[in-house]
A protein has these predicted regions:
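Short beta-strand segments enriched in small/hydrophobic residues
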Residues: 14-18, 54-69, 173-179, 330
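Flexible loop/hinge segments that line or gate small-molecule binding clefts
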Residues: 119-161, 234, 260-272
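Amphipathic helical "hinge" segments at domain boundaries
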Residues: 30, 45-108, 112-116, 193-197
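Hydrophobic alpha-helical segments within soluble ligand-binding/sensing domains
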Residues: 147-176, 186, 212-218, 236, ...
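An alpha-beta-alpha
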Residues: 162-201, 302-316, 321-329
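Periplasmic-binding protein-like
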Residues: 63, 106, 113-121, 173-179, ...
Length: 332
């Protein structure tokens, strides 16, 4: 952050900022002084700060700058474990989906001379801030970002595996239960479509159901759906509860498969057939990749992260009701 940028943010001249930070502000309006000082502190400005801080000495600190604090704890655990294993400490920041807050955190990370950053940008516009890290020679690994060189969990692959499991149970009338404006849901749907295509099952927009749609359950019944792929475990629980309330049951009336994140790990009932999202493994992986960059052990990384995907149970799976053999016992 330069003195010119501070002046622009405060709406004053460069000389005014210079006078305030050098205690030569006797003739400056107190309100202006307070505003400038707040911006100086918020954006971690220090005179000649861009002349580094360019110490070549390593700090053995890694910054983690997340889009929001709703990130899974297991991903952070994975990052922390991999960092400690290699002798690094972590600086953790939450942008709160706010680009202004994000920039303040970026200037703080630069001031603290972090060796590298794991960065989840708030928006595509956030990429303009990349120059602050470039100027300080700070290595960056992006996650869930707006660049081709961004690390992602392969949710499309997971969507494919969930769908294939229903097909293995002979379900062909399928739907995908999603959340609107969710990157995870969009990728799960992509895998869902690919699996249908490769199994020569026609795709229809009617197969897309959104948990925010009050009519989604009626659509399941009216469309004769026998199997559901769910991108979020919370949505699966809502569906499960609604079915029981209306005297429909899983798996006898509907088979259900879902992704499951770590906040749901302790739920032992209902038994929904799920694949755990590998957040911890992902966190460890991106941290190791960043440390390799910091220590000049660069190679071509795999940006799409995949792990062995295993169902925790198959309790919410049965073949479609019309395929089940009914046994009749004749007495007498």
């Amino acid at each position: 952050m330069t003195i010119k940028e501070i002046a622009n943010l405060a709406g004053v001249s460069i000389s005014t900022v210079s006078k305030i930070i050098n205690n030569k502000d006797q003739n400056i309006n107190p309100e202006t002084r307070s505003r400038v000082l707040k911006i100086v502190k918020d954006y971690n400005y220090t005179p000649y700060g861009n002349v580094k801080n360019i110490s070549t000495a390593k700090s053995f600190q890694i910054g983690v700058l997340l889009r929001s604090g709703s990130q899974t704890n297991l991903m952070l655990s994975g990052i922390l474990h991999a960092a400690q294993e290699s002798g690094y400490s972590i600086l953790l920041y939450d942008s709160g989906n706010d680009m202004e807050m994000e920039l303040k955190h970026i200037t703080s990370l630069c001031k603290n001379n972090a060796d590298g950053i794991i960065w989840e940008p708030v928006s595509e516009q956030s990429m303009q801030y990349e120059r602050y890290f470039t100027e300080q020679n700070i290595s960056v690994c992006y996650i869930n970002g707006y660049t081709e060189c961004s690390f992602l969990i392969d949710f499309a692959r997971m969507g494919y595996i969930l769908t294939q499991k229903l097909l293995d149970y002979k379900h062909t009338r399928l739907a995908c239960l999603l959340k609107e404006k969710s990157q995870r849901s969009a990728l799960v749907l992509e895998g869902f479509k690919k699996c249908l295509y490769e199994n020569q099952i026609p795709y229809s927009e009617k197969m897309e159901l959104y948990i925010s749609d009050r009519e989604y359950f009626s659509k399941i019944i009216n469309y004769g759906i026998s199997g559901i792929v769910s991108s979020h475990f919370a949505s699966s629980l809502i569906l499960y509860e609604q079915m029981e309330r209306l005297h429909y049951y899983i798996p006898s009336d509907l088979s259900l498969v879902s992704l499951k994140d770590d906040v749901r790990e302790g739920i032992s009932f209902p038994h929904i057939s799920s694949v755990k999202i590998p957040y911890c493994e992902f966190g460890s992986y991106i941290c190791r990749e960043l440390i390799d960059k910091c220590e000049k052990r660069e190679h071509d990384p795999e940006y799409l992260f995949a792990a062995p995907y295993v169902f925790d149970n198959e309790d919410s799976l049965e073949p479609p009701s019309f395929m089940r053999v009914r046994k009749i016992v004749v007495v007498g």
